[in-house]
């Protein structure tokens, strides 16, 4: 049987853009997108994507060309996730919270042929173009504005805009047929830049195959039912969720875009609301608060380099018999690999041996599978480091519990080494989140003359717990209260020796806390016990 060859009939490259074609054929009356008063069916979305792809091809967009987009959650950015790869190109969604300098850095590196930008960001576009014009190497960039659908505002006849491209597109039958026939499933489908909380962002290249299999893995792992309604409250620019909104088309679901200015009313829901959350590890105390609001929480772990969600907390029926607090502790774990993850492990960096499954011994989380990126664009050194020893080295520190579930403990750069002992900043944060005064917390290492490093907690208090007229004595008393609370719930060497109160924590465009900024602040701080030693 080894000599049986693959052929065109039995070897069709995998790509998630086929989800769209199938949805339009199978569910002609099913809603695909709800955006304010705008409604589209799957055939309408399919037609718009085909027209947009045809227009891109007419603009000489070809295989592996990069198309960048800066836009909020709108039907346009959803359509581009299908239409751009249908034209053979690579979509590069850019975070709208980045400033002009950061976006210009990405554009210089990605070298896109087209930049789509929402009309709301027109001043930002002018600043970006000014910065690009100062370069020695000119980027020949076509800028196309996106206006709201059915907007009365239209650009001049000399400018191209998004809706005009769709109207002008002529998707002939042969052209459409070729749109869904990619040459190689390992061809790139998207270029996403990491959030860059610890360094300059890197361009992560994802394949059609990786996006396809991860989409199916997410749908199966989340137990997404048929005809789901998916409410988008996170930016479409994040690869972490690309798999869900592309895969949702295969489940004949539809997308709802949530506008943050409007309160989220859950009073009219007809069934349970399932909430998927990822990013930084979610404290059990926060899971408990969210579930009491009526959500069913699914905790996931993912990263851009793994095409988004990679581990799910796989709920076991016997856990339903546990107390609420015990259940929340289990839900706070990140869990097991999804379908597209072949293997996941936690290993010692020095020996590359697996850590014991005791829920205590920490190591680096590593994984391999069809979900893993192709590599970093134009950065072979970083790609080599990421794939050392035949695994994707995530840079995240975790443990494996006796039941095989993985729990993240920290980023490797956020581990605090005090007197030779490794301290998980996340573990300390989880304890502080249980204190009724604490709204938000981040724990980082601060220098210590005796122990080398010691934990320092930066805390935002709950509303009503502080005001500008509070005197220093009140803050000192609160600091002592929180340190004593940690000493009651943690080994003393893990407890913060300094607490700093802030009105808000510094965050990047994705909402991740910028711990390097906080570590910089600690260089000017002195722990109380250290002050006694110095004196």
Curated annotation (Swiss-Prot):
Disulfide bonds: none
Enzyme class: ligase
Keywords: Fatty acid metabolism, Ligase, Lipid metabolism
GO BP of this protein: fatty acid metabolic process
Database matches in InterPro entries: AMP-bd_C, AMP-bd_C_sf, AMP-dep_synth/lig_dom, ANL_N_sf
E.C. number: 6.2.1.-
SUPFAM superfamilies, per database record: Acetyl-CoA synthetase-like (SSF56801)
Domain of life: Eukaryota
Molecular-function GO terms, alphabetical: ligase activity
UniProt record similarity statement: Belongs to the ATP-dependent AMP-binding enzyme family.
Function: May act as an acid--thiol ligase that activates carboxylic acids by forming acyl-CoAs.
Protein name (database record): Probable acyl-activating enzyme 22
Taxonomic source organism: Arabidopsis thaliana (Mouse-ear cress)
Taxonomy of the source species: Eukaryota, Viridiplantae, Streptophyta, Embryophyta, Tracheophyta
